[in-house]
Amino acid sequence: MRLRVWTAAGACAALTACGTAPDLAQIQRQHPPSSAWLLDRHGAVMQEVRVDFRRRQGEWQALAAISPALQQAVVRFEDKRFADHGGVDLRALAHALWQNLKGEKRRGASTLTMQLAGFLQPGLASGARKGVVGKLRQMAAAWRLERRLTKPQILEAYLNLAPFRGEARGAAAASAMLFGKGASALTQDEALLLTALLPAPRALPAQLAARACRYAGQPADSAECARLRRLAQQAVQPGQAARAQADAAPHLAARLKLLPGARIRTTLDLYLQRYAAAALESQLSQLTDQDVEDGAVLVLDNASGETLAYVGSRRGAPLQQVDGVRAQRQAGSTLKPFLYALAIERQILTAASPLDDSPVAITTPAGQYVPQNYDRQFRGRVSVRTALAGSLNVPAVRSLLLTGIEPFHQRLLQLGLPLAQEAGFYGYALALGAPEVDLWSLTNPYRALANGGRVGAARLLPGPDAASKPVIAPTSAFIVADILADRTARSVTFGLENPLATRFWSAVKTGTSKD
């Protein structure tokens, strides 16, 4: 004990001052994760996003959350007298000095605490190469840490900051990168391989497996060593590293611009998010012969405006990085419900009013505008109910002639649709959805049909419900929703049996846009 105190005093004298070591909380704050996490409404992790590309630092793990196998292996093979020394293993140091004097290959004498001092102060990491003073500085820093932290805290900090492979720092990052799992789930073999990486983070698979085999105390030709070689090859070989990060909402994560270490709870539901992604994949797989490659899904809670699912694209699509929820597309027939709601509200039409579905040519300053139905057929006189449910184009244009272009344009703005042009720019094509809008702006107005005509902002994050305002008359909203749920009225275009005919009450509307 007296020798240790004297040596520490000498080291401090050489440096003029000992300084103060940080506590565990300070260490943790100084090393935030390189990722951020997006959580669903229940706290489940939906998306892990790397936002700091200077390093790969895993989320800080409490010692109890790190595999005991890894803890034991690191202590045994990196610092076997960790529990007994005060930061510097004088026996190991003396042995290393003796080997050096004899010209033999020197064994490492740095303890876990000394290595941790190097992680915290990179200038100390190469203390051995900076001569006696450099080594004394590293030893003094280790003693300061021992006085400040408990042994479990030192081990926790070490396992969270140690460089294992490449840019992966900490057991969490290394476990995820190499084995596709959390640090708590490491097996004995995986713990041995991670420990074997500590003295040689760049080791080739064969070298790594050989060291892990020696740690295991098994002969090179044993089944245990063969298993370690296979595992090392799989984990370390370029291009073979596994990834265990959550990846259910990449587009939403990109939209929210997360900061390192952030854990943001959203209004989404992970189960519904996965279900929506699977439904999109299933639907698109049936449309491959029609050259449909991608799509998006947005699910909003009608009452609260909370976003329940946000799928920006199909996984593996050529442009999967594009967020289809925010991409601009022509609205198509999805604007028709709001046109008819306006006409009904102003008592220009009722659900039973007849409209003529026959060829029409409208004179405009740009020439003749001649709308066509999707199937290029005409059905003669039809009711408003049939025209809207069957998404007929010509009756919609005739309805716009009755309401006027400017009033309908104003109604769309009131509903929150960010139209880029004035009413005259779109002309009568406004009835058929000529404006470009995104799915986020288009979906929210449909909530008004379920909320008595009231419109409020949709949201992604928990909080009080947004204030709403009346835009559509309640009776008009009810009538339009009833029409959109009318399977019989819809059959004029879609038939009685089609994907829109659900087993429960649902108001649905299709829309087609052009590329």
For the regions a protein language model found, what residue spans apply to each?
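Short, well-structured active-site flanking segments
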Residues: 83-93, 170-172, 223, 318-321, ...
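Conserved catalytic neighborhood of penicillin-recognizing serine enzymes
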Residues: 99-126, 238, 242, 349-408, ...
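Non-catalytic, structured segments within soluble enzyme domains
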Residues: 105, 109-274, 410-423, 428-433, ...
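A penicillin-recognizing enzyme superfamily signal
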Residues: 19, 266-289, 297-301, 310, ...
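A short, well-structured edge-of-sheet supersecondary motif
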Residues: 35-48, 66, 290-317, 410, ...
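Short active-site loop at a secondary-structure junction
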Residues: 57-66, 290-295, 318-338, 346, ...
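Active-site SXXK
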Residues: 72-75, 79, 276, 304-305, ...
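N-terminal type II signal-anchor transmembrane helix
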Residues: 1-41, 81, 224, 228
